[in-house]
Amino acid sequence: MKPILLQGHERSITQIKYNREGDLLFTVAKDPIVNVWYSVNGERLGTYMGHTGAVWCVDADWDTKHVLTGSADNSCRLWDCETGKQLALLKTNSAVRTCGFDFGGSIIMFSTDKQMGYQCFVSFFDLRDPSQIDNNEPYMKIPCNDSKITSAVWGPLGECIIAGHESGELNQYSAKSGEVLVNVKEHSRQINDIQLSRDMTMFVTASKDNTAKLFDSTTLEHQKTFRTERPVNSAALSPNYDHVVLGGGQEAMDVTTTSTRIGKFEARFFHLAFEEEFGRVKGHFGLINSVAFHPDGKSYSSGGEDGYVRIHYFDPQYFEFEFEA
């Protein structure tokens, strides 16, 4: 399984994301550059230039017309995917940590950090109403008083958002009223990543408490746990098989205070039902910050602390693999 190596960032990768069809791969890092690549051969299509700080999150809408990015330069920006033109600039008081389009692509949400005396907020904008964008006035703003949101995704049918917090809590917020619909706390430390399954019925969380967990996306009922020895930064569900891939590792600054060695975190594959690890893929130098499955399930990508993105196409053996319980 020889990976395709994508070199387009000078700093560590923060998030990678495929569009719905999977022909494009968007990558963002702790530099101001947003890159888009052809996922089939790793050719760089272009960059979205405009941010002036680290970019924390990226999302593409249903038909890949628009791209949304959130950055530490205290802004969330909307781009034309094809031309790279900046369509909207939404200023915030603190860094934008998560962002996303709803199912129809007409409503965007993003969350800001709790920093410099400012509160953590989730803001909702309707792109069909230009006045909201022009006046930078969201139709709804949800304050998060306790612990800041570290990862958030839209729930099924765009009725709610599922947010993971620094404290390990999971909340489901209504996209209409802003109230908390469900609240659970299954993780003991920060939730780094949330990714939905293809049919949006379940999602996987990756946490600093060395586990990834599977939840029902409507009830937030905890289903499965995947345990590792190091903090998990990202987890993704296969669209075809009952497989989940985990990426993570020990942060360099934590290495001396713990008994684990630096790096030493390959991409790890677990069986979804049996919670058993069945494979590992080496490659990155240092930890893995983001993983994503291609929507056809035939390849996956990982972005690391080393600033590289690797696209791995699975060998035929992967598709013939039968898990014996």
From Swiss-Prot:
InterPro entries the UniProt entry points to: eIF3i, WD40/YVTN_repeat-like_dom_sf, WD40_repeat_CS, WD40_repeat_dom_sf, WD40_rpt
PROSITE patterns assigned: WD_REPEATS_1, WD_REPEATS_2, WD_REPEATS_REGION
Residues carrying Phosphothreonine: T219
WD repeat residue intervals: 8-47, 50-91, 144-183, 186-225, 283-324
Pfam families cross-referenced by the UniProt entry: EIF3I
Modification sites for N6-acetyllysine: K264
Modified residues (Phosphotyrosine): Y308
Modifications made to the protein after synthesis: Phosphorylated by TGF-beta type II receptor.
Alphabetical UniProt keywords: Acetylation, Cytoplasm, Initiation factor, Isopeptide bond, Phosphoprotein, Protein biosynthesis, Repeat, Ubl conjugation, WD repeat
Localization: Cytoplasm
Function comment: Component of the eukaryotic translation initiation factor 3 (eIF-3) complex, which is required for several steps in the initiation of protein synthesis. The eIF-3 complex associates with the 40S ribosome and facilitates the recruitment of eIF-1, eIF-1A, eIF-2:GTP:methionyl-tRNAi and eIF-5 to form the 43S pre-initiation complex (43S PIC). The eIF-3 complex stimulates mRNA recruitment to the 43S PIC and scanning of the mRNA for AUG recognition.
Family: Belongs to the eIF-3 subunit I family.
Protein name (database record): Eukaryotic translation initiation factor 3 subunit I
Annotated source species: Pongo abelii
